[in-house]
C-alpha cells in the first residue's frame, strides 16, 4: 500500500528561517493521522530538518544526519555531503525512501538518496506531496510582499492544504 504524506516548506527572510510541515499521514485512500510531526530541531537547535516520505525512513535519516552534524561540529554542508554519500553507497541506506530538507543560518538544502544536495537559487525550498503548491505560493509571497519568513510559511502551507489532498492545515513551524 502506498503511503502519501507531507508538505515541508522552508523560507528565509531578514536573517530568519522558518520551516513548517503539515500533520497529515495518508494510507491508501484514508487519512490515518492528522498531527504527525515531520520537522525537528537538531544539533543544539541550530539546524531544522523536515522529511517527506516514509516516516521510519525519514526518522532514520534524521538520526544519521544528527550523527554527522555531531561529527562535523554542526557544519550542515559537510554533514549533508557525507550523509548523501553514505545514503547512495550503503546497501541498507539505499533502500530508504524519503527526502530531507535541512536548514541552518547559512544553508538551505534538499538531500536525496540519489546523492543530490540541492541549494535553491532563492531562499524558498519545499518537498513532499504538496511541496510544489507550497513553493509556488511562497515564491509569490516572497517576491511580492514584506511578510516575515514565518508568515510566508503559514500562508503558503495553508494554500497547499487547500489544493493537495495529502496536506492538511495542522502545521508545525520552527524558526532559527
Curated annotation (Swiss-Prot):
Positions annotated to bind Na(+): 161, 164, 167
Gene Ontology molecular-function annotations: metal ion binding; threonine-type endopeptidase activity
Uppermost EC category: hydrolase
Record-linked InterPro entries: ATP-dep_Prtase_HsIV_su, Ntn_hydrolases_N, Proteasome_sua/b, Proteasome_suB-type
Compartment(s): Cytoplasm
Keywords: Allosteric enzyme, Cytoplasm, Hydrolase, Metal-binding, Protease, Sodium, Threonine protease
Activity regulation: Allosterically activated by HslU binding.
Reaction equations catalysed: ATP-dependent cleavage of peptide bonds with broad specificity
Disulfide bridge positions per record: none
Gene3D superfamilies: Glutamine Phosphoribosylpyrophosphate, subunit 1, domain 1 (3.60.20.10)
Active site: 6
Cellular component terms (Gene Ontology): cytoplasm; HslUV protease complex; proteasome core complex
Keyword Cytoplasm: yes
Annotated GO biological process: proteolysis involved in protein catabolic process
EC number: 3.4.25.2
UniProt family annotation: Belongs to the peptidase T1B family. HslV subfamily.
NCBIfam families noted in UniProt: ATP_dep_HslV (TIGR03692), PRK05456.1 (NF003964)
SUBUNIT field: A double ring-shaped homohexamer of HslV is capped on each side by a ring-shaped HslU homohexamer. The assembly of the HslU/HslV complex is dependent on binding of ATP.
Record's function text: Protease subunit of a proteasome-like degradation complex believed to be a general protein degrading machinery.
Protein known as: ATP-dependent protease subunit HslV
Organism for this UniProt entry: Aquifex aeolicus (strain VF5)
Gene coding for it: hslV
Amino acid at each position: 500500500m502506498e503511503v502519501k504524506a507531507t508538505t515541508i516548506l522552508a523560507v528565509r527572510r531578514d536573517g530568519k528561517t522558518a520551516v513548517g510541515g503539515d500533520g497529515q499521514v495518508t494510507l491508501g485512500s484514508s487519512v490515518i493521522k492528522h498531527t504527525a510531526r515531520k520537522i525537528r530541531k537538531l544539533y543544539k537547535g541550530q539546524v531544522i530538518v523536515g522529511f517527506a516520505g516514509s516516516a521510519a525512513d525519514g526518522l532514520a535519516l534524521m538520526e544519521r544526519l544528527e550523527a554527522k552534524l555531531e561529527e562535523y561540529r554542526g557544519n550542515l554542508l559537510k554533514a549533508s555531503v557525507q550523509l548523501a554519500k553514505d545514503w547512495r553507497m550503503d546497501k541498507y541506506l539505499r533502500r530508504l525512501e524519503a527526502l530531507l530538507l535541512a536548514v541552518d543560518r547559512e544553508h538551505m538544502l534538499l538531500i536525496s538518496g540519489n546523492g543530490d544536495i540541492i541549494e535553491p537559487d532563492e531562499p524558498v525550498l519545499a518537498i513532499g506531496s504538496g511541496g510544489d503548491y507550497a513553493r509556488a505560493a511562497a515564491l509569490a509571497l516572497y517576491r511580492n510582499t514584506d511578510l516575515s519568513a514565518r508568515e510566508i510559511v503559514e500562508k503558503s502551507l495553508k494554500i497547499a492544504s487547500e489544493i493537495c489532498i495529502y496536506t492538511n492545515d495542522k502545521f508545525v513551524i520552527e524558526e532559527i
